[in-house]
Amino acid sequence: MCEALQKYGVTPTRGSAFGATFSIALMVSCVPALAADQVNTGYFGGVAIMGYDPVAYFTEGRAMKGSEEFSYDWLGTPWHFASSKHRELFIAEPTKYAPQYGGYCTGEVAFNGATINIDPEAWAIIDGKLYLAYSKEFMAEFKARPSDLLAKAEANWPAVETQLEQDGFQ
């Protein structure tokens, strides 16, 4: 039984359609994701790049949490911004500000041709493009030799993106 079921003391029972449906739904949510959204929304956040403002990396030079008050849906996903000005900049040029590889970890795309979550504080802008990673330590390595890693990530991304589309995330 997965931790979420144990946490809530849920035990599947026979003969209960509601119990069976509830248990199945909860168990499915406990299975590690084999597929991921094309835009990284975190594990349960439902907001692009864990609610961080993609424009702030460029204009403020730092990671900033966005606000639901300043949100915009792009690629079927809500994006949060720290201000209405940042939201308007993003609306005008989303591909300029959106992170590469759907906001997933650049290293995971490069080394494993897969997606994992990120630490929004682990970031770099290289040649005018935003890259995110799972840790600040990895990002330090990435900044030391970006061309090697980007070549691998660029080679792997089309297959990763295709897999995401095949899994029904567009």
Residue ranges of predicted features:
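Extracytoplasmic entry segments of secretory-pathway proteins
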Residues: C2-L5, C30-A35
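Charged, low-complexity intrinsically disordered segments
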Residues: A33-Q170
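Basic side chains
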Residues: R14-G15, R87
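Bacterial N-terminal signal peptides
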Residues: S16-C30
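Compositionally biased, disordered extreme N-termini, encompassing classical targeting presequences
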Residues: T11, A17, A33-A36
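N-terminal secretory signal peptides that target proteins for export/translocation
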Residues: M1-T13
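Short, solvent-exposed linear motifs at loop/edge-of-secondary-structure regions
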Residues: L5, F18, F22, S83-S84, ...
